[in-house]
């Protein structure tokens, strides 16, 4: 809108009436290239207010109109069934065939894009889609963006090779990464991927848990030694710690005297195959443990202890699914405890709040808070069979419909109708660092349609798609969540399992179901076979020969 490059942090100037009229990103203390110093900017703004106030008023009006235009997506009724295929081909064409991920630098994980490509492979059988996903995961999991000592992924890579990260660790990135890696592992059974899920979720519980059960937001990039200082190594440090074993470790993790980042070494395994022999991996595990213990003596980066509903929703979903897929009760318990924490301390008169910090919950929830927590509730239902999670999801959908829906143009606003101090209410389906709330709502509404049999949820999902059909038709990769959800709505797959959830045969059926890495698939497990409404997926079904039974349904 202002004709300058985006970035962060955002610096905006507002009128006394709180209307934005000009802004930028970072302004240095001294002029740098074509960027003025911050004091020069302040001086210019002061001059405008004193001598050219009309220009500020004109700019504010123009910016307001531009924001309103951006907040009004092109409307085109729905998406034809064949659109998913053409969209997936377009996304595949912009993937990096050498290093994986979207082309160029900096490189972000872009998990919704990877999920869409995986979905395209499961639908079409074209191996190019699968290969694009596995290539990206291999490079991310072996690159410097991954913390090879402590587990967990950094925010993004500053280069196209996934080597040098921006060292900040975000809860939402790690939740999304473990979700896609778990999905791919269900198909490939690659032990390397299992290791990365295990290390990352163990890191999440170890370093991101807050008292009571929720998860903190981030771990900063900066530590007292500067950005990344906590994570990088000089060769002589490793030689001192590992002694005669250092040569083997240095080859495995790309360590050299000159370093690969500002004279020091970011550990990575990009030059080696994912896993060596079991004996060699055991040796490396011992070496990593020694370095991890030594690193713990350094002053660590600061943790942002805020508990955010939306990011916790993503973490809960990943932990719940991975806990079931890998049979890890600790992860499953962590998912349930975090969900209970949100419901216990972050609800006010039945409505979600966005943030909890230092014992206080505050700030009105956004669409993303509800969408991700509904997704979390449904993930917990799928993995536990506890129907109270479905009830909670339905309650939250009702709140969204009452306070967030755009009754004129369809879809959901990012903020509720009773929020204050906003110059406009935005409504978008674009993914950013996290999936789009509207795209996620299509997915969860489609899931609710499958698990309840109530067509009203399918209709609501279709209405959201109708609201953003024109945007999706432009082919932006940032609409991956919405387009993936459209395919789920048009090709729903529901596996209904009847039997004792703790019984050996039922567990075997659940395990076989999770071996099918189908993004469109919803799994429901029922022990209670009491009468249900005619449209309910359990209606008319019973165990065959008194044995646990699975029904595959296409609603």
How would you name each of these model-derived features?
Residues 193, 331, 361-364:
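Catalytic nucleophile-loop/oxyanion-hole region of alpha/beta-hydrolase
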Residues 139-146, 337-345:
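Glycine-rich, acidic and aromatic/proline-enriched surface loops and short helix-turn segments
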Residues 120-124, 184-192, 322-329, 380-387, ...:
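Inter-helical turn/loop segments and adjacent helix faces that build the functional surface
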Residues 206-209, 344-371, 378-531:
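Long, polar/charge-rich, low-hydrophobicity segments
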Residues 319, 334-336, 376-377:
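Glycine-rich phosphate/oxyanion-binding loops and their immediately adjacent helices
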Residues 1-318, 322-325, 353, 465-555:
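Replace the tail clause
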């Amino acid at each position: 809108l202002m004709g300058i490059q985006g970035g962060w942090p955002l610096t905006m100037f507002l009128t006394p009436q709180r209307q934005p009229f000009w802004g930028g990103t970072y302004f240095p203390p001294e002029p740098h290239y074509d960027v003025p110093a911050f004091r020069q900017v302040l001086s210019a703004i002061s001059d405008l207010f004193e001598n050219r106030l009309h220009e500020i008023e004109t700019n504010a009006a123009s910016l307001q109109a531009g924001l309103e235009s951006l907040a009004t997506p092109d409307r085109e009724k729905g998406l034809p069934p064949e659109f998913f295929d053409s969209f997936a081909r377009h996304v595949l064409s912009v993937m990096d065939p050498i290093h994986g991920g979207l082309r160029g630098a900096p490189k972000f994980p872009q998990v919704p894009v990877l999920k869409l490509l995986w979905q395209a492979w499961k639908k079409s059988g074209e191996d190019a889609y699968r290969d694009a996903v596995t290539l990206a995961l291999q490079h991310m999991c072996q690159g410097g963006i991954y913390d090879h000592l402590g587990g967990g992924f950094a925010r993004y890579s500053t280069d196209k090779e996934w080597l040098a990260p921006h060292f900040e660790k975000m809860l939402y990135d790690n939740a999304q990464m473990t979700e896609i890696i778990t999905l791919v592992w269900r198909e490939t059974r690659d032990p390397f991927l299992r290791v990365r899920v295990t290390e990352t979720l163990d890191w999440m519980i170890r370093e991101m848990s807050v008292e009571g059960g929720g998860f903190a937001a981030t771990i900063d990039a900066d530590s007292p030694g500067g950005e990344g200082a906590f994570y990088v190594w000089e060769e002589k440090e490793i030689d001192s710690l590992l002694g005669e074993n250092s040569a083997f470790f240095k080859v495995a993790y790309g360590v050299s005297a000159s370093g690969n980042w500002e004279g020091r070494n970011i550990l990575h395994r990009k030059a080696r195959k994912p896993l060596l022999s079991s004996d060699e991996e055991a040796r490396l595990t011992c070496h990593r443990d020694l370095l991890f213990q030594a690193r713990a003596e350094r002053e660590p980066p600061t943790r942002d202890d805020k508990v955010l509903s939306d990011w916790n929703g993503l973490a809960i979903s990943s932990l719940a699914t991975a806990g079931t897929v890998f049979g890890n009760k600790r992860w499953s318990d962590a998912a349930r405890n975090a969900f209970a924490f949100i419901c216990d301390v972050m609800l006010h008169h039945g409505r979600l709040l966005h943030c909890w910090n230092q014992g206080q919950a505050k700030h009105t929830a956004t669409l993303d808070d509800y969408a991700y927590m509904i997704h979390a509730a449904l993930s917990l239902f799928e993995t536990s069979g506890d129907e109270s999670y479905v009830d909670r999801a339905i309650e939250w959908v009702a709140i969204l419909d009452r306070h967030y829906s755009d009754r004129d143009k369809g879809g959901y606003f990012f903020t509720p109708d009773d929020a204050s101090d906003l110059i406009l209410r935005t409504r978008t389906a674009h993914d950013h660092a996290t999936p789009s709330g509207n795209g996620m709502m299509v997915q969860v509404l489609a899931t609710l349609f499958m698990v309840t049999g109530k067509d009203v949820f399918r209709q609501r999902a279709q209405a959201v798609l109708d609201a953003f059909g024109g945007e999706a038709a432009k082919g932006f990769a940032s609409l991956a969540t919405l387009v993936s959800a459209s395919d789920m709505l048009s090709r729903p797959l529901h596996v209904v399992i009847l039997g004792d959830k703790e019984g050996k045969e039922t567990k075997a059926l659940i395990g076989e179901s999770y071996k099918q890495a189908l993004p469109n698939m919803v799994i429901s497990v029922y022990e209670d076979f009491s009468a249900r409404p005619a449209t309910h997926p359990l209606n008319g079904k019973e165990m065959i020969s008194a044995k646990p039974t699975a029904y595959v349904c296409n609603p």
